[in-house]
Amino acid sequence: MKTILLPTDFSKNSINAINYAMELYRNEPCNFYILNVQRASSYISDDMMGVGSSATIYNTIIDAAKKSITNIISKLKKQYNNDKHHFEAIVDYDNFIDSINQVTEKYKVDLIIMGTKGATGLEKVIFGSNTARVMQRCKTPVLAIPDGCTLTSLDKIAFTTNHLTVFNIKQLSMLKDILG
């Protein structure tokens, strides 16, 4: 059984990557971990005006993210109706890369599938890309799904690496599996 991590920020792009994963592995048993990473600095105080005095901002943020992931899982189960697929929601309140690394280690993740918008020019230099950072800083293979990409047949695949990385058989077998 494959173990796949699906990071999401609930954007259209990340949901597209999740749907791509469902299609790509429709015939294989998989455990899918859907991860959302939250940071307090991501929120503006106006967003939290409705928080009651007994609730903490932290709990409110985590609960909202858990509810959103639960909704995604419900939609996936209904849309794909696949008994081979199992889902678990994970919400973390941490640094994005640290969270990805912790989850991949804890659950022995075989592959990370995530969306990418492909930041260009000055935007890439200043902000970078979450997907690019995951590729650079995580040992687990990453399948980056471009914005709007749908699964048809794979006729092109980019294998990005640097000259310092030595790949093991397990990492390369994921690429072989994807290529069929």
Regions found by a protein language model. Give the residues of each.
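A short acidic, glycine-rich active-site loop
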Residues: 53-67
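Local beta-strand N-terminus motif with an aromatic residue
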Residues: 1, 108-110, 154
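Active-site-adjacent beta-strand anchor residues
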Residues: 7, 90, 115
